[in-house]
Amino acid sequence: MKKLFNFIASLAVLFSCDTFAININLAADKSNLNIGDTLELQVRVSGLDDNAAPSLGVYDLNLGFDATLFSLNAVHWGDSVLGNQLDLAGFGSLQESTVNGSWLNLFELSFDSVADLDLLQAGDFTLFSVLLTAQAIGEGNFSLWINSIGDASGNELSIDEPNGLAVIVGGVEVPEPSGFLLLLGALAIFALRVRNLQYPR
């Protein structure tokens, strides 16, 4: 009976941890692109409860990318649909982005009150989007490193390990001429030769 109780208790703890697991992950708008194409990377948080504590109030992240394959274009803060979930009351937020070689550091601190963040913030949303341009052929690997992340009061949140992803950059494809165009070209050359035979210079 005691073993059964311990087993049930262990399952309860396991499911409880899974239920309240908070994740920050990378998502790309494409997995294959050509030189000159633009890639959009989104960094998303999930696992928070809608309109309830804990909410997200501050984060400090490093985004790793291959600087030989991609050049940084822009950083867009917030969710394109839900808006910036760290600026719910319109007071703004402290935002900083710094590039150091193949690392992009992104920091944001909300100026909203604890009550506004806990009561108004969504459970799943995009923190920011990064736009990059492909500039060389190869496989680009992206990684995310969490320096720190805190709730509305600044207390540290427990976060699962972020995912990584890879994107393939290929060369620009040159379209091959269609069979119909090749046939027209051959007919034109044949007609020109026949004409030269009929009307020699």
Placement of each model-derived feature along the sequence:
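Terminal edge beta-strands and adjacent linker/stalk segments
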Residues: 156-170
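Short, charged juxtamembrane terminal tails flanking transmembrane helices
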Residues: 196-201
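Low-complexity, serine/threonine/proline/glycine-rich extracellular segments that form mucin-like
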Residues: 29, 33-89
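Structured beta-strand segments within beta-sheet-rich domains
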Residues: 45-47, 83-138
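Contiguous beta-strand segments of beta-sheet-rich domains
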Residues: 135-149
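A short, hydrophobic C-terminal helix/tail in secreted or cell-surface proteins
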Residues: 175-194
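Boundary at the C-terminal end of the N-terminal hydrophobic targeting segment
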Residues: 19-23
